[in-house]
A protein has these predicted regions:
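Basic side chains
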Residues: 2-3, 30, 76
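N-terminal, post-signal-peptide region of Sec/Tat-exported proteins
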Residues: 40-80
């Protein structure tokens, strides 16, 4: 009987897991994430209803994973790439891997946001890997009031397919 229950849990976990994050499901709590990532660290959040937990340096070229929990339920995963090690060649490799494993993006959206004297400019590509998850591949530059780029970042955002994407 224990084997049947264990088999069911294993099949459930891997059948409904978030793409690229085996064992993690939408709606998981911090406690569930802690089982897979024992070194979760709380990050500051501008939204009091959202807690952000991160894992530093989980893989090569990745600075950290960020897990966004609203009401203690996972509703977004952000992969923050290490901008010191990502160049044009690595960017192309990431894009090629996405298009090879998922397919071509279904949408390209420009990003243009003014925040005080800074401007965020970039693009995001929307991928649909399955019926439960959407993936957004986003490159964003921060431009100061003098028109100079002060920062540049690259993200992969995973969200449940029923959620609206807000950068």
């Amino acid at each position: 009987m224990k084997k049947i229950i264990l088999l069911f849990l294993t099949i459930y976990t891997f059948s409904f897991s978030i793409r690229d994050f085996n064992g993690i499901n939408w709606g998981d709590s911090k406690e569930n994430l802690s089982i897979l990532f024992s070194n979760l660290k709380k990050e500051p959040s501008i939204n009091e209803n959202v807690n952000i937990f991160s894992v530093k340096n989980p893989k090569e070229n990745i600075k950290k994973y960020e897990f966004y929990l609203q009401n203690n339920a996972l509703n977004k995963i952000r992969v923050v790439f290490d901008k010191e090690s990502i160049g044009k060649r690595e960017l192309q490799q990431i894009y090629n891997q996405l298009t090879t494993t998922i397919g071509v993006p279904v949408l390209k959206l420009p990003i243009y946001k003014k925040i005080d004297n800074l401007t965020l400019k970039g693009n995001t590509l929307k991928f649909v890997p399955d019926t439960q998850t959407l993936i957004y591949f986003t490159g964003i530059d921060t431009i100061n009031e003098l028109g100079k780029m002060t920062d540049s970042n690259l993200y992969l955002d995973y969200i449940p397919s029923q959620n609206e994407y807000i950068f």
